Amino acid sequence: MSEPYIIYNDDGWSSYMRYPAPMSPEEVVAVTVAPVAGTGVKVYQFCALGGHAVNYNSAFLPRVGEMLPAVDTLHVWRMRETLRHLESLGTNPLQIVSQTCHDNGLACQFSLRMNDRHHTYRHGDGSWYFPELLSPWLDANPHLLLEDRALDYTKDEVADYRLRQIQEVLDRYDVDGIDLDFTRFKPWFRPGEEAVGRPKMTALLRELRLLTRRHGKTLSARFEYNPQVCISSGLDVEAWLAEGLLDQVTLGGTGDHTPDAPSDWWVRRAHAADCKVFPGIEGQLHWCPGSGGGGGGLHPGDGIADGFGPPSLEYLRAVAANHYRSGADGVSLFNFTCADGPFARAAFDELAQPETLEGKDKQYVAALWPWDAQIFYEPWSSARFLEPDQFEAGWELQLADDFELQRCLRHDFSAVLTLEWKGLNRISDFEISLNGVALAWNGYEYNHYDHGCWNDIVQYSVPSFALRQGANRLALHRTAIYPGFAGRTEVRKCVLDLRFNQTITPGALN
C-alpha cells in the first residue's frame, strides 16, 4: 500500500461566492489551493457542479449567472463578476487552480456531478431557487430530461452531451483526471427503467475510460457508501470495478453526514482491481431541523455539539481511523469550502497519517437516521427505537483505537456517551450498558424542543475498561412501562467522546 493521502473536493462555487468581487487570480489561489498546499492533500478536485452552467470557460456551456437578465443575489453577482474579470485577464478558475496545483505538487481532477439537481429546485411560488444554474441546453432538450429536469441517462444524446463536456475539458485544460460524482443525485432513469439504463451507463463509463486513457489521464468516481443503493439505482458498480474502469473511488452520502458508514465492501473489490478507495467526510454537518438554509445562531457552530457547522477535529479523526482499519488508502474531504465556520487545518496532515491517530482524542458518532435523510430539512424517525412494549434494544459502535495497547503503555483515557432521547419519562427508566458494563448517568441533562416534541440529551460515564477495539455493543434495557403511551422511545443521537490524558505524572503506587 502506498502512503495514504487526502483528496480535497472544492464544491465549485463557494470559493468565489463567499468573497468580495472581483477576485484576482492571486486571491483565487489564496482561497482554493493555498490552504491545502504542503499538507497531506495530494489531489484537488475542481467541481463543475452539474455541468450545465459552469465556473470555467467553455465553448458551448454558459457560465454561472450569465443567462440572468438581472442578478439580485449578492453571491451570484460576486461569482459572475469574478468570472468576467478573470476572463478579461485571459484566464479562469479551472486554469488557475490546475496550474497552481501543479506548481505545488498536487494532482488536479475535474469533478462533474453526474445528475446534480440544484438547477431543479423551486420556491413555494414556483420560481427557481438557483436560476443562475439554468442553461439553454436544458430548455432546448426537454425530451432528454426526467420529470424534474434532471438528465435521463437512458437517452443516447445525454451520453453524447457528457462526452462532449469532458472531451472539451481534456482538450483545453491541464487536468490530471476526470472524476464522476454519482452522489449528486440519483435517480438516473425514470422509475422502472433501471434495467434499460444500466447497460447504457456502463457503456458511457467504458467510453470515458477509453477517452481518459488516450489523454493519459485517470478516471475516478464518487459513490454512496451503500453499494446496494448504487446497484439498485442502475449503477453496475461491482462490474465497473471488476472491469478496471476506475483508478480511484471516493465515498460519500446524499444526506448530511455518514460518520460510521462501512467502506469494507468497496475496499475489497477496488483493491482487487488496483483501484484506490478514499472514504469521504462532509464539511458541513446538520442536526438542527429549523436552520435549513444555514446556521441559526450568532457565531460559528460545531456540527455535532451545536447541531450545525463543520466537524470537529476529534470527529474527523474518529471517522478516518475506522476507515483506515478497513484498509482505505486515505480519506476525501467534501464540501469543506462551503462549511459554515472554521475547521482545524491540522486535519490536512493528521488525516493522512493513520499511525498518528492512535491515542488522540476522538468523537465517535453513530448514524441513526436514514442513509439519504436531509437531516436539517425534514423530520425523520430514528433507526434505534423501542416500541411501547419492547424491553431490549441495542446496536454496535465501531471504535478504531487499540485500547489494550493504551493500557499496556499505561496511558489514561476516559469516555462519555451522549444520547438524545425522544419519549423518555425518567432517566432511570432505561439501563444502559456497553459490552455488558453498566453505564451511570453523569448528572448532565439538557431538555430541548426538536421535531415536534421535547427531547432530552443525557450523558453517561463510560469506564475505560469497558472499551474495546472494533465492535462495541451498546444495549438498552427498559425498566418502566408508560401506561397509555403509544409512542416509541427513540435514541436520536449517539455520540461517544473519547479523551486521552496527555499529561505525565511521575510516581505511582501500582
Residue ranges and their predicted role:
Residues Y16-M17, P22-E26, L49-V54, E87, ...:
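Acidic-and-aromatic substrate-binding clefts and catalytic sites of carbohydrate-active enzymes
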Residues R407-L417:
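Extended extracellular/luminal ectodomain segments enriched in beta-structured repeat modules
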Residues E157-K276, Y315:
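Active-site neighborhood of glycoside hydrolase catalytic domains
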Residues V41-E87, K186-P191, Q248-L251, D260, ...:
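Aromatic-lined carbohydrate-binding/catalytic grooves of carbohydrate-active enzymes
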Residues E3-M23, L68-Q99, D103, Q109-E168, ...:
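Active-site-adjacent "subsite" loops/lids of carbohydrate-active enzymes
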Residues E27-V54, D171-G177, L245-V249, H323-G330:
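Catalytic domains of carbohydrate-active enzymes, especially glycoside hydrolases
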Residues V43-G51, Q248-P259, I304-D372:
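Substrate-binding cleft of secreted/luminal carbohydrate-active enzymes
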Residues W421-P506:
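Beta-strand-rich ligand-recognition modules
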